[in-house]
Amino acid sequence: MEIRKKPNIPMCLVLDSSSRPFMTLLFTILLFLTGLASAVGAVGGSPTAGFKPADDILIDCGSKSSTKTPEGRVFKSDSETVQYIEAKDDIQVSAPPSDKLPSPIYLTAKIFREEAIYKFHLTRPGWHWVRLHFFAFPNDKFDLQQATFSVLTEKYVLLHNFKLSNDNNDSQATVQKEYLLNMTDAQFALRFKPMKGSAAFINGIELVSAPDELISDAGTSLFPVNGFSGLSDYAYQSVYRVNVGGPLITPQNDTLGRTWTPDKEYLKDENLAKDVKTNPTAIIYPPGVTPLIAPQTVYATGAEMADSQTIDPNFNVTWNFPSNPSFHYFIRLHFCDIISKSLNDLYFNVYINGKTAISGLDLSTVAGDLSAPYYKDIVVNSTLMTSELQVQIGPMGEDTGKKNAILNGVEVLKMSNSVNSLDGEFGVDGQRASMGKQGMVATAGFVMMFGAFVGLGAMVYKWKKRPQDWQKRNSFSSWLLPIHAGDSTFMTSKTGSHKSNLYNSALGLGRYFSLSELQEVTKNFDASEIIGVGGFGNVYIGTIDDGTQVAIKRGNPQSEQGITEFHTEIQMLSKLRHRHLVSLIGYCDENAEMILVYEYMSNGPFRDHLYGKNLSPLTWKQRLEICIGAARGLHYLHTGTAQGIIHRDVKSTNILLDEALVAKVADFGLSKDVAFGQNHVSTAVKGSFGYLDPEYFRRQQLTDKSDVYSFGVVLLEALCARPAINPQLPREQVNLAEWAMLWKQKGLLEKIIDPHLVGAVNPESMKKFAEAAEKCLADYGVDRPTMGDVLWNLEYALQLQEAFSQGKAEAEEVETPKPVAVPAAAPTSPAATTAAASERPVSQTEEKDDSTVDQHSGTTMFTQFASLNGR
């Protein structure tokens, strides 16, 4: 083997035939090691590996020469950046060197007594950091502590009437304001505008490109938990960037030159948290997460629950961050499971301002492995803000793996308001922001007070007009209803409602129950109080403080429905009131609980009275009345609100019966609004097997006809008294809809009806009922009737059955003479004729047009002739 070097030619290896195999292997190993080193460098090497900012403009304002910071960054002097500034006159001031300052850029400043503008040409538009550095050092030109000024861009207000002495109590402290702006133009300007009679100043300016993946356009909103899009349309101010459980991270150790502060000053109780750490090289970024989001040093440290090994660690670790309640906030939470020994062993909840932000977080599942970073972006609306932003982590409280929780980092960014301001309520053009929360509260208070006076007047008037016949005092009195003023509700209670109150009436969410109150009424959710079990969780019976018996549905944190459906049901039921819809009384979401409180339905689900529970069989008339009640409830959902509502989970277990067997539709966790004018909602397929609309399944387009199909299956359950799906039966009988329609087409449907109905059903009534079910089960939604049409046919079937029953009773009476003496016949009087006529069924033509009686039994008219409050 020889090595030859030619002039101006790169060195190369020339191998003889004897050494080629060995050298080939050596060369392969060399290439492998080179690639491995590159890979390690990409993950754990240079902090800024993988990203070089297109724009990196650093200015040391007031400096006569360039300045190098401790982290090695070079800020250019005034003379090197003169092309950026437009100012009538500016004053340069400086301070003597000091080792107490974090950077030498704070030793000089530029003072403006009139408006001054810095203009920059961007190499590449997009996300940029804008960092403004301030330090009010003593000088003989101007008292910088008293300088009052604003800083604006073409679109955003960054600082409004800013005064350093107001922003920081420590006059010797430096201040850095960091902003993240999505710049869409090639030009960017910073305007310093002193207040009249004052001055503006600046020590240093940074304008640095940020990676596009730093903030995506979509996140998650808090309460209700929903998707939040349009994040790229906001400007952001970094308020807190915290390395939980770890030390200060300086810009030279961050992937994007950021500063991460320790979390101890924000911890509410340090005794509840325990710092944990691992070697940063153990952190492996999964696909979709890069070191640019946060460096390995953030994910390699964290805080877990202290004493997590105790039998019942029922507490949360809490961090409090002082905040401005007038703004929305963007919260980025960083997680990395560095405490578990195996996968799927750590489940915990995350709360923001007392609301559940993440339920049942399993980091090894969402991140794909242990020691794999994961982050979550959450938008907190200003209506949920107070003077402090609170972040909490805690165990799920169920038997789900290790009772522990972990948090590795927190970033809190203020979001620009409706006039694109990050400071104050005025925009660049002087326009004022929309009414803030305090103004909303004041206005809401006035509306509520006005509504209370109106309601009080109505009560007094009704009291004066009350019935004087005290034997009628048990009759329904409308003046005892809750008083509504807009979306606010006022109610009285025998105990003054000292345990709980109506929560956020502006949201119309009903009464908020404390967890301790619900634990008391359910004997701490004792199994003996369970009256039902569903996919969402257990249902308990209880009696609240005013003596009302209620059903309390406690969500299972591992439920497939989850927190989204929990909030959906609250919002749906809080705005719906109908005789045939179950009423929501209130809810509780304390400590990650998802609890709904309903009116108690003593006779339980419709299904229990048809099969499986050995209850007394329902008569055909009772089944018809129950189906009619459910149809009325669904018809109201589809047409009785400004936006139609599709239930999406109609089935016999979601039709509940009260003590009088009045049917009420329940369980709105999967429901969807349909905007007026739209005929469908494109959404993922959800529902219950056996009731699912085949067209919805094929096209993933949900319509009100999807509910109609499901209701058709319920009708067959009522007729045949068997489940919608029974896999234990022969193959052709498994699916009730297919099996029943097969017999219907043969004209032999009566062969498969509930044996308890044989001989007790009017054939014409059953025929009309079966026709209604068949139409509901049409393959295509366009061929199915509306719920109003279904309701008409069911009421007709009920009238046929009532006529049949009455005729049968009269025939039996004729056949069985009474063993008493019969007086001589007397002439029939007009009164007798009238009485006899009143006993026969009332025909459609004999009904009064203004009749709007809505009884669950004894129907005397068809619903289509009554006011259904439809759209």
UniProtKB/Swiss-Prot annotation:
Domain of life according to the entry: Eukaryota
Entries under SUPFAM superfamilies matching the protein: Protein kinase-like (PK-like) (SSF56112)
Methyltransferase in keyword set: no
Pfam families recorded: Malectin_like, PK_Tyr_Ser-Thr
Protein name as it appears in the record: Probable receptor-like protein kinase At2g21480
Coiled-coil stretches noted in the UniProt entry, renumbered to this chain: none
Keywords: ATP-binding, Glycoprotein, Kinase, Membrane, Nucleotide-binding, Serine/threonine-protein kinase, Signal, Transferase, Transmembrane, Transmembrane helix
Keyword presence, Glycoprotein: yes
